[in-house]
Amino acid sequence: MDTSRLTLDHFLSRFQLLRPQMTHKTLNQRQAAVLIPVVRRPQPGLLLTQRAIHLRKHAGQVAFPGGAVDSTDASLIAAALREAQEEVAIPPQAVEVIGVLPPVDSVTGFQVTPVVGIIPPNLPWRASEDEVSAVFEMPLAQALQLGRYHPLDVYRRGNSHRVWLSWYEHYFVWGMTANILRELALQIGVKP
């Protein structure tokens, strides 16, 4: 699919018809979830955050709203929606959940489930200063271009680990966020 013609309807039909394949068995047991907020527009957007610089883990990194499942969450989807409300003030009832992607292991020991949801374009996003330093929207067509992701093999605790890297404007997108976006691009089948 040509990215210049990526409408929300095209994205939805391809997302629903082309189900993701499990690429590997996850090893981590602690559960977390992130929301992949697709902004409902004729040319859809993707809402991303930049984590606050003072955080202990992943400080300053571009990320999806999300976090660990807690005892009040009825499901992984509920956890993603709760975290999105806490981090960027997206009301759970404003999200039209369209599905989930296969879980991904994080280097911090979590099994992270990406939840894909459609959000209205007129939401007054507000970053929680405790967790988020910036909220920005990237065109979905750009996020789903496979050619924008570049591999880097790193070694951590004696093991080789492939990390994906990309840029959008002045934001450096890498690690789990870039990996999730790349997997979504592979599923949707968008060509540069």
UniProtKB/Swiss-Prot annotation:
Stretches assigned to the Nudix hydrolase domain: 29-160
Motif Nudix box per UniProt: ranges: 67-89
CDD domains: NUDIX_CoAse_Nudt7
Record-linked Pfam families: NUDIX (PF00293)
BP GO annotations: nucleoside diphosphate metabolic process
Cofactors, names only: Mn(2+); Mg(2+)
Database matches in PROSITE patterns: NUDIX, NUDIX_COA
Enzyme Commission number(s): 3.6.1.-
Task of the protein: Probably mediates the hydrolysis of some nucleoside diphosphate derivatives.
Protein family membership: Belongs to the Nudix hydrolase family. PCD1 subfamily.
Name of the molecule in the record: Uncharacterized Nudix hydrolase NudL
Organism in which the protein naturally occurs: Salmonella dublin (strain CT_02021853)
Taxonomic path: Bacteria, Pseudomonadati, Pseudomonadota, Gammaproteobacteria, Enterobacterales
